Amino acid sequence: MTKRKIVSIVAAVLLACVVAGGSFYYYASHHVVKMIPGHVYQYSSNLKGKDNSRSMYVAFSENSDKAIVTQDKSEALKAGQSEEQFEKVYKAQSKTASWKYKASGNKVTLGKVENKQLSQWQYNSVLAFGKHFSSSNFTYQIAKAGQGQVKQKMTFKQID
């Protein structure tokens, strides 16, 4: 083989790797929109390589922008059984606070309305594949408490 042929083959292989990697990244960064409706996720954080032992659960409605956020795994799983069960659990939870969600591109936003005050958490740089998605950071705006950004990995694992 000539030197020119070897360089051409190496360049073609590198180009194929870049295209494949870019395609996977695009898929993973835009797939969350399709994967969360109608499912239940356990989410927890990871800071400096250490997992947080506290977990929360979120159930996403299949047909609306409603969400249920709870520390009770059985309540979240019950909400994930059917849209009818979801509405029952949502109605009970919304007596104190109601949750909504929006997923677009590589962002997921959870909003909580409590006492007519809105608090929001926006998970940025979301990568989704398999039965989980993760975010490398999130921003928050808490009613009457302030706002900020947290550079902490959040992992959402599908449990239903």
What are these regions (language model features)?
Residues 31-56:
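Tryptophan-anchored aromatic micro-motifs
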Residues 48-52, 70-144:
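Contiguous, well-ordered beta-strand patches that form the walls/edges
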